[in-house]
Amino acid sequence: MCDNMKRLFFAIYINFLLLNSVSAQHKFTYRTEKLTTCDSIFLVDLSLDNEANKFVFDNVRDALKMAEKVRANGLKRKIRIFFSPNVYWVDDKDDNKIVMPEKPNSGVASGIEIKAGNINMIGLTGNPEDVVIAGNRGEKYGADRMYTMFDWVGDDLTMEDLTFGNFCSIDLVYKRNPDLDHEKRTDRVTGAKIAIVRGDRIHLKNCIFKGGKNTSPFNTINGGRHFLENCTIICGENSLPANAVFLNCKFTFNTNKPLYSPMQTGVVFLNCDFSTNEYKPFVMRKGGPATMIDCRWEVSHLRNELIYWTQTGQIDMRAYLSNNTVNGDSMKLWVGPWIPVDITNKPLLRAYKLADGTYNIFNLMRGEDDWNLTKQNTEGLKKIPTLLSVTQRRIQLENEVDEVNIGAKAYMFSDLNNPVPAKLTWDFEKPSYKEYLRITQDDQGRCTVKGIKENENEKNVTFIKVTSANGLESSSRINIYPRQLPPPEFTKTPELKRVKDELVLNYKLDLQNGLRDESVIKWYRCVKDKDGNPVKDKWYLTATTNVVGEPHNRYKLTRADEGYIIKASIATKHQRCEANPQVWSYTSDVIRNAPKQISYDVNMKYLPTQVQPDIVDGVWTMTVNKPADTKKYKWSVERQDSLVWLYDMGFDGAANSYGLTLAHRGARMMFTPESHIVYKAMSIQFDVDPCKEIGQGFAGNDGQYMDLYIMYNNRTNSGYALRIFRDKDYDHAVKMVFLKYTNGEYKKVCEPVAVTGFRRGCHISLEMKGKKLTASLTNKVQVPYDTLGIPAEASLTAVVEPSTFGGFGLQHTGSIGGSGIVIKGLKLDWK
């Protein structure tokens, strides 16, 4: 049956019900309003029978699905759904089945999916505690993925006088009738949302939202306007909406990062109260536009009397503040990567708060359609922008050569489509930057910048600031690179020489006037033909230069190099030029009499990081691999280049820590020593800084882990491994377990143990000797928060079948970026 015919029959059915059952419709009172149920007035009451023909329901799902049908039938007016006092579950609270996403590629499983707008859900008594709309599922606890009670598509949604709670990891306490109390599904904090919305004009009024991690009180994921007034929010990390205005709201945070990152024009907190026990409270994890006016923080374990605005900021954003307190005193804000702007005495304050003390909600919510949800008197109110955005956050220019034009635009809150006029002024963030940069401003509010320091050899980083007449600010980072010169020439041509057990590339460059050697040197080993003779038609990269300014001109030989020709390439460079074309140097003969490799202290600065799939003795194998046990989890392609690893700085918990980091999810490295040797013992010393801060290691428990292979046959994927993994039991710890691999299939050879030390400062020791396999994870970095009885250090011991292979490997299946790792050190020893 076509959709039009379905709608026709449904319309006939609805009209029949309305014409023949008016006298049977249910009558009730809301405040002083006497109401009768109809196609735009629903009543949900557990004490009544579920009678769709009367628009009376005993559950949330049927009411919303009827609203969806009525709306699809063409009804234009608002649908009001009233709830009598009770606890309403979106699905069976005691059902142990695992909810799967309805769409195969969706990352979210849902309780109720609905496509309908212009709906108002209302608690009948006016007390939000009387009506509880509840869910009881979270990621890995009743749901296969991240779970949301509502997955809603629709504009103009209003929720009023209701409590919404995902009680997967918190207890439901219903004061009106304790018989309806319900114990949480798990003690573990897990990803459990209340609602995600693809829509605009979302209004939450006098509601309570309760949850753990990822609470999501009707968060709009498409940038739609979102207004919460007189609401109470109790939540964990990454919970708050990213584009919203909060008025007179109360927050209790069970995390130090309740908001992941603001989007669009950001978030605004007006006259709100915040409470947390976290020792180092952040407003958000990653920076974006945000404003806080007339707010109060109560923090029981405050460190240094500071509120930390964000862990990772954006160059051009600002924190706009006025009249905020922490524990009764004026708010002290950690500047960090953001610059706070006190707007108390600036015209910008009027964008948020009028002279009479009322809050300018219309200015914030009006958008392109002048949405005036609070019925504010708009006479005489002008548009006051709240966001100033530069056209370029980061600029690179060549000193004394390049001129770059920069502009900025001002925007109203919740409207990025229509920039508004603003008078702009450009200046230096610091007076000292004038030594390196010249700013020229035109009469259109744009500026031109040029590097001006003569004969400068070094890169200089400067910041310029743009300010609007009403007090908005933004900035650009300008990296001024020295004026380019020709690359250096050789004064001594490259020559490969063997010095004991090393090859040394000797050369000299013509470097004057403070220039330094930043040449890129790479080392290669040839292949052999089927008869074992060296040939020069294919080369394996065995070492490289990963760090600018540290040319790797020495190559340590091992017995795996015997019988091969080694070559080195050098691309000469200093800090004021691009690299020259490569010049090659070769050993005059094959390598002979190299030492047996019994110890290998791996220097991450020189480790090859590009894809190299072949398994060859003495050569690193670098691949992106999706293990079979992650098959059911969809991975997105995160990079489109040949790198598997990067030598770079970490994120979040590994900020300012340099080492080898993931370039791809599924990054794997393997090293195969001399394969003809029978190995009796092997040990691994591994130093790592995970980016996750509190010991959880990975972004989720969807097949994310790290395996360290020991005494491994890389050719057959057989041997042993220590697995570090996150599972559903903990949000602040990982588990570690031994695995035995046989042709890529594995089984556990011990019981897992939990540990919280898989965070910055982690050291892992792994050893196999005969039948004894041991591992320890230690961390001497003390943390000020409660680890809930889980130790920071742990060890494992198992008796296993011996292995005679000496291969090493590392497989990481976690996300890149903030869920990755920084490998600081790796040492391998064999007997």
Regions found by a protein language model. Give the residues of each.
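Bacterial N-terminal signal peptides
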Residues: 11-20
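Sequence-level preference for short, compositionally simple segments enriched
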Residues: 26-53, 57-387, 418, 461-463, ...
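Low-complexity, Ser/Thr/Pro/Gly-rich disordered linker/stalk regions
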Residues: 59, 82-111, 124, 147-149, ...
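Carbohydrate-binding surfaces in secreted/extracellular proteins
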Residues: 78, 295, 684-686, 756-798
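Secretory/extracellular carbohydrate-interaction modules
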Residues: 129-131, 167, 648-737
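Ser/Thr/Pro/Gly-rich low-complexity disordered regions
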Residues: 383-425, 430-601
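Short, aromatic/His-centered strand-loop micro-motif at the edge of beta-sheets
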Residues: 741-763
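Flexible glycan-contacting loops in extracellular carbohydrate-active proteins
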Residues: 787-824
